[in-house]
């Protein structure tokens, strides 16, 4: 928590996520002996706060969102193009620059579907340690580089350090039980329907339905949003636990090269889409970036862009990546 306030004081973008991410990553790599043996960040705690972000995003789904639907053929088409080209670029970097074997390079370079990529890659004989490392580093590099890059481009830090708020600070405490119930209900919905990234899209779908019907509108207090960022940032940083420094440094260099190539592709597509749709370039770039759904939604919220628009495209990116991965995996198995 303290690292979040320090990040805010020095003008760090998304300070309550990037501050804890930096400190927890430092502890996991430089001071691993300070952690309990076999320590893993509690995933149930992470899921609870992802559900809260899902509720926030779902509450932003209004009829106005569908007024942009005539642009969706172009934006979804751009995401489709991005997935194929980004995967090819990542594979080339991991295979030829990193020297990874073809199977590890293939599954490590997917621009989405983190858990599915790891599961299918392990079954196909990939180096699981390197595969997991590169997939988590992809998200961490995007989450770190994108807000910093946008801050430099816009000339001011994005997020709460820039004075932007992502929620109302004056939500009454009496609303908290309702928020908790809705979050639990959304988690159950995501599990039953097996939604992609269901821990967030389930609560998002529930909040969107309640918002569109006018039955209920969710206002999440700012302190709870800050807590969610702290938990998510710490969880990402703790992913470095157990990795040797040499392996991690080499993996980080490869991740920066791969993400740099993918984001460059995203910038080009965002500029082209801006000319065709009139949508802001920064919002389009966030929509195309190969980061985690939850983290990219937080970046969108920090820019006061509609996170529902961004999230819909990220869900499509993940579904498309996983479907393509499944088809190619079956083809590789038949060929092999």
Segments the model singles out, each with a brief description of its role:
Residues 9-25, 45-49, 71-83, 104-109, ...:
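Structural signature of hydrophobic alpha-helical transmembrane segments
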Residues 32-39, 57-71, 88-101, 271, ...:
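Transmembrane alpha-helix boundary signature
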Residues 225, 240, 251-253, 259-316:
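Membrane-interfacial helix-loop connectors
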Residues 18-19, 40-53, 73-78, 99-110, ...:
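Cytoplasmic-side transmembrane-helix entry/capping segments in multi-pass membrane proteins
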Residues 82-83, 111-117, 132-154, 265, ...:
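Membrane-embedded alpha-helical segments of transport systems
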Residues 62-72, 153-170, 215-220, 246, ...:
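Membrane-interface helix termini and inter-helical loops of multi-pass transporters
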Residues 1-43, 52-64, 174-244, 264, ...:
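Structural signature of multi-pass alpha-helical membrane transport proteins
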Residues 97-137, 279-313:
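Alpha-helical membrane segments and immediately flanking helix-loop junctions
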């Amino acid at each position: 928590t303290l690292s979040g306030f320090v990040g805010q004081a020095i003008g760090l973008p998304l300070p309550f996520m990037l501050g804890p991410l930096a400190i927890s990553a430092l502890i996991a790599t430089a001071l691993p002996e300070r952690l309990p043996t076999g320590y893993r960040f509690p995933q149930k705690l992470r899921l609870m706060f992802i559900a809260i972000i899902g509720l926030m995003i779902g509450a932003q789904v209004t009829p106005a969102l569908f007024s942009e639907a005539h642009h969706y053929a172009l934006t979804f088409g751009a995401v489709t193009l991005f997935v194929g080209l980004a995967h090819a670029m990542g594979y080339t970097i991991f295979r030829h620059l990193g020297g990874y074997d073809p199977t590890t390079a293939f599954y490590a370079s997917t621009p989405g579907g983190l858990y599915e990529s790891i599961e299918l890659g392990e079954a196909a004989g990939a180096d699981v340690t390197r595969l997991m490392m590169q997939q988590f580093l992809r998200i961490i590099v995007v989450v770190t580089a994108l807000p910093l890059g946008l801050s430099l481009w816009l000339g001011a830090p994005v997020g709460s350090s820039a004075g932007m708020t992502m929620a109302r600070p004056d939500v009454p405490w009496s609303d908290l039980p309702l928020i908790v119930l809705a979050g639990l209900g959304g988690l159950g919905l995501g599990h039953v329907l097996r939604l992609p990234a269901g821990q967030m899209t389930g609560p998002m779908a529930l909040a969107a339905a309640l918002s569109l019907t006018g039955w209920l509108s969710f206002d999440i207090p700012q302190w709870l949003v800050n807590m969610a960022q702290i938990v998510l940032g710490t969880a990402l940083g703790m992913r470095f636990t157990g990795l040797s420094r040499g392996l991690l440094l080499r993996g980080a260099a490869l991740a920066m090269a791969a993400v740099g190539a993918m984001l460059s592709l995203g910038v080009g597509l965002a500029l082209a889409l801006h000319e065709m749709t009139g949508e802001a370039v920064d919002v389009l770039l966030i929509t195309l970036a190969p980061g985690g759904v939850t983290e990219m939604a937080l970046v969108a919220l920090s820019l006061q862009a509609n996170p529902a628009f961004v999230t819909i495209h990220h869900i499509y990116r993940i579904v498309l990546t996983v479907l393509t991965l499944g088809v190619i995996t079956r083809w590789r198995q038949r060929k092999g």
